[in-house]
């Protein structure tokens, strides 16, 4: 499993967005602007092996999405629509007129909703094992809609490998340093309440809510931006068939399936991912 730290984390920066204190990283001072959107219950640390490489040629922003990481945890819905509107406010606060959106999992779903709402703010799209392209999602995600299950979660280091195991193809090789990156996020007080709210806003026991994914699928043909679809062949969170759903609906796409990868190709195969994205951005 070729995960290895390639950089130290950039300094944490904060910006108030609609009264919500939001953590972000920014690297790079030339080229076009990129916004990196992590998945549900993730954080900007997920992009640690990509941001410095991308920033050699681009101005790159990554932020803890509302209710995630070290950003504030407001009350209310965490639907894709709400998160897309929050992204719009964040980009305005940081003077990002338009950008390429690179979204993994729920971040991909947010990118798709945002592109439908604000097409003039999106230059290109990179969808990485994206949510929002069908009902199917892992049972573990469906179970976080149940209070009794979420209340069992405890912020111990031992839980991190157990929770992330199904995300990776080479699950037995999760690096120890990755546990150290993630543990402070898991240990933040009040996380369980947010996990439940995030789950119930977007999922039920059958999978992704129809009112969440169906409008996205129905509007794919209207997305004219060049779109790079990247998927891990052995994704156990969101099945690879959703990559082909995206390809069938999008009029201007490039599809890349990563063999021997799971839900996070940018972590399991960072060098390949970085080369592919940089090539797509310059094409």
Where are these predicted regions, by residue range?
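Catalytic active-site module of serine/aspartate enzymes centered on a nucleophile-bearing elbow/loop
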Residues: 253-283
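Acidic catalytic loop of the alpha/beta-hydrolase fold
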Residues: 234-238
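Short beta-strand/loop motif that positions the catalytic acidic residue
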Residues: 223, 229-231
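Flexible "cap/lid" loop of the alpha/beta hydrolase fold
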Residues: 116, 124-156
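Conserved HGGG/HGGXW glycine-rich cap/lid loop of the alpha/beta-hydrolase fold
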Residues: 20-70
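Active-site loop/oxyanion-hole signature of alpha/beta-hydrolase fold enzymes
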Residues: 17-18, 25, 48, 61-106, ...
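Conserved alpha/beta-hydrolase catalytic His-Asp/Glu region
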Residues: 22, 156-219
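Alpha/beta-hydrolase fold catalytic core
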Residues: 1-34, 56-58, 96-97, 278-283
